[in-house]
């Protein structure tokens, strides 16, 4: 039986930190679903369709990754995808409390859903999509933090 895991997030846009996490997840699970949340309340820079396309391009080299957009409750989405593992990235201790609350709620809603926390590699531990966008808005060089296709799309959005 295939072990299916979901790595959810807004991914606005997907960064090399996200790619690091999903790449390592593919080494642990047979199939990884990169689940891109619609998240309209976060007012994303990129549309859901754009974020899905950018993530598909950025993960094309990872054969066991499927990129899917969603707007459902995570536990319902996981159940519909026949996934029993939820992958979450932890950059700092500050992330842990919120992630623990989410994990407990998801476990309440779907008892068979296990949360697995991965720390990004050291070089990506301080970046976030929000930080990358903010630096780029002020003409800072964010080339190192994004896949090439995502960097081009971000620069086009900010032009």
From Swiss-Prot:
Cofactor dependency: Mg(2+)
UniProt xrefs under InterPro entries: Cyt_trans-like (IPR004821), PPAT (IPR001980), Rossmann-like_a/b/a_fold (IPR014729)
GO BP of this protein: coenzyme A biosynthetic process
Protein name: Phosphopantetheine adenylyltransferase
Membership in a protein family: Belongs to the bacterial CoaD family.
Pathway given in the UniProt record: Cofactor biosynthesis; coenzyme A biosynthesis; CoA from (R)-pantothenate: step 4/5
Highest taxon, organism lineage: Bacteria
Function noted in UniProt: Reversibly transfers an adenylyl group from ATP to 4'-phosphopantetheine, yielding dephospho-CoA (dPCoA) and pyrophosphate.
Keyword Ribosomal protein included in the entry's annotation: no
Subcellular location: Cytoplasm
Binding site for ATP: 10-11, 18, 89-91, 99, 124-130
CDD domains according to UniProt: PPAT (cd02163)
Record Gene3D superfamilies: HUPs (3.40.50.620)
Tagged with keyword Transferase: yes
GO MF terms, alphabetically ordered: ATP binding; pantetheine-phosphate adenylyltransferase activity
Subunit composition and interactions: Homohexamer.
């Amino acid at each position: 039986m295939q072990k299916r895991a979901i790595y959810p997030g807004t991914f606005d846009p997907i960064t090399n930190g996200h790619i690091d996490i999903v790449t390592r997840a593919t080494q642990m699970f047979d199939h990884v679903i990169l689940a891109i949340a619609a998240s309209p309340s976060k007012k994303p820079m990129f549309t859901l369709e754009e974020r899905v396309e950018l993530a598909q391009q950025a993960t094309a080299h990872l054969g066991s990754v499927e990129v899917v957009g969603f707007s459902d409750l995570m536990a319902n989405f996981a159940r519909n995808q026949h996934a029993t593992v939820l992958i979450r990235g932890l950059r700092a201790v500050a992330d842990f409390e919120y992630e623990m609350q989410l994990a407990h709620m998801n476990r309440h809603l779907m008892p068979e859903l296990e949360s697995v926390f991965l720390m990004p590699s050291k070089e990506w531990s301080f970046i976030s999509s929000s930080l990358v966008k903010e630096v780029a808005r002020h003409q800072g060089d964010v080339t190192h933090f994004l896949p090439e296709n995502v960097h081009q799309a971000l620069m086009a959005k900010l032009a």
